């Protein structure tokens, strides 16, 4: 009764959701399948409960162990495509051309964030006002995290990797009007 995971599972089995709305559109079978797909891990037992623990954790030799939980697999499958800035390296660089390219890139990335969030499990079940609020409060963090991740992944954090066609090193950044 005191285990939060067990209480959550029982509430979900009864048709309750975190947002406070009941599953009106879903039948009980769909709800149970969704709960099975995103299983809550059981608490680990103490050493004196080893017999009960071995009864809960038994694997047959031919049973495969999942390396990635279903939620991680889902997130990997909805990973957004690579977005290009449309920056023309052949033209002389001016602060307005760089700023224009960054604005166009931010617009494309924002659309990508909205599309990505709509494909997240449970996001569309939220009220539309809640969806808008979540995107309003998180878009900048998601975009900055994406910039940091791309910079780390592609150029080992030595440059700012905005897009494959717009990578700024420290010297180029100092030469731009953004640095001062």
From Swiss-Prot:
Location relative to the cell: Nucleus; Cytoplasm
PTM: Phosphorylated on multiple serine sites. Several of these sites are hormone-dependent. Sumoylation is hormone-dependent and represses transcriptional activity. Sumoylation on all three sites is enhanced by PIAS3. Desumoylated by SENP1. Sumoylation is repressed by ubiquitination and modulated by phosphorylation.
Span list, region AF2: 71-180
Listed GO CC annotations: cytoplasm; nucleus
Zn-finger segments (NR C4-type): 1-11
Metal-binding in keyword set: yes
Domain of life: Eukaryota
Keywords on record: Cytoplasm, DNA-binding, Lipid-binding, Lipoprotein, Metal-binding, Nucleus, Palmitate, Phosphoprotein, Receptor, Steroid-binding, Transcription, Transcription regulation, Ubl conjugation, Zinc, Zinc-finger
Alphabetical list of InterPro entries matching this protein: NHR-like_dom_sf (IPR035500), Nucl_hrmn_rcpt_lig-bd (IPR000536), Nuclear_hormone_rcpt_NR3 (IPR050200), Nuclear_hrmn_rcpt (IPR001723)
Modified residues (Phosphoserine): 60
Annotated positions binding progesterone: 150
Residue ranges of domain NR LBD in the record: 63-180
Name of the protein this chain belongs to: Progesterone receptor
Organism: Notamacropus eugenii
